[in-house]
Amino acid sequence: MATERVKGYRAPAGRPGLGLLDPRVLLAACGGDAATLEEICQVLRARLPDHLTAVHEALRERDAVRLREAAHKLCGTVAAFSTVVAAVASDLEDQAARGQLEEAWPLVEQLEAFGRELIQQMDGLSIETLRDQAGAAGDRDRHRTASR
């Protein structure tokens, strides 16, 4: 479950830009094109607040159907940016489908915090930065695999 994977999530200290953004996924989504990157970042900035509001309102009104739909839309919106945030949104969608509304509050709070962080991490984002981050992430993955 995503909540178990992200419960202790913290952005890497002293490593600006590394955190929730998944550079490999984002590079694939924009095809390595700066104009496309800027366009999808603008879409996220425009839509994310509305999606988060819809999720919060649906839960506050205890409307499981609306919550599931809002979480699904949120998941689709963030999937190109963060596999972590998308996984939490997917968990929220699953909880709403099961009618587990009380259990959904911590996920909504996590998504709101992650949403703010994603927007901050997009400031000054460039193809070059993403490529550097993707390389650093690959180096960390190789190091972890080698040390096992």
Question: Which sequence ranges carry the predicted segments?
Answer:
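Two-component system phosphorelay core
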Residues: 1-148
